[in-house]
Curated annotation (Swiss-Prot):
Role noted for this protein: NDH-1 shuttles electrons from NADH, via FMN and iron-sulfur (Fe-S) centers, to quinones in the respiratory chain. The immediate electron acceptor for the enzyme in this species is believed to be ubiquinone. Couples the redox reaction to proton translocation (for every two electrons transferred, four hydrogen ions are translocated across the cytoplasmic membrane), and thus conserves the redox energy in a proton gradient.
Gene that produces this protein: nuoI
UniProt-annotated binding residues for [4Fe-4S] cluster 1: 54, 57, 60, 109
Residue ranges annotated for the 4Fe-4S ferredoxin-type domain, each copy included: 45-74, 90-119
Protein family: Belongs to the complex I 23 kDa subunit family.
Name of the protein described by the UniProt record: NADH-quinone oxidoreductase subunit I
Organism annotation: Deinococcus radiodurans (strain ATCC 13939 / DSM 20539 / JCM 16871 / CCUG 27074 / LMG 4051 / NBRC 15346 / NCIMB 9279 / VKM B-1422 / R1)
Taxonomic placement: Bacteria, Thermotogati, Deinococcota, Deinococci, Deinococcales
Annotated positions binding [4Fe-4S] cluster 2: 64, 99, 102, 105
Gene3D superfamilies named among the record's database cross-references: 3.30.70.3270
Amino acid sequence: MGVLDIAKGMGVTLGKLFQKPLTVSYPEQRATLQPRFRGRHVLTRHPDTGLEKCIGCSLCAAACPAYAIYVEAAENDPRDPVSPGERYAKVYEINMLRCIFCGLCEEACPTGAVVLGNEFEMADYRSRDFVYGKEDMLVGVTGSRPQRREALSAGRPVRLGFQVEGGPRAELEGVEYP
């Protein structure tokens, strides 16, 4: 190893010194999320009726490779329906410690009820707090309270799910995109 090799290494180091840093001073600065980012799961409602979109079919649980989703279905009462189908999800739980955020549950859902949102700050102290129930995940078409608060401070609409090109997917009709 000669002096020339050391000079080359120092040249690379000095070159990087004057470039813009790649790191972000989180939480003071926030990096922009990519359009296909998959964060915390949310269960959506129909924009017109306010009924839950989840019909309790358990396809999301069957598609989950990490076995993180548990769905228990019940018959829907025609006088006071919870969802537009014959059944609804009486129990919907997801263990976020097991979830690998692959998005297969979102793809498997025939009604578009399961959406991977853009929330990623899910820190907590107890492991049992990472098992989200239906009440923790159910949001309207305007998003959850933290999503609305963040969107309001950023001056942009709430974004649920992702969109590659074109208009919103039919299952997410009524959900606003950036």
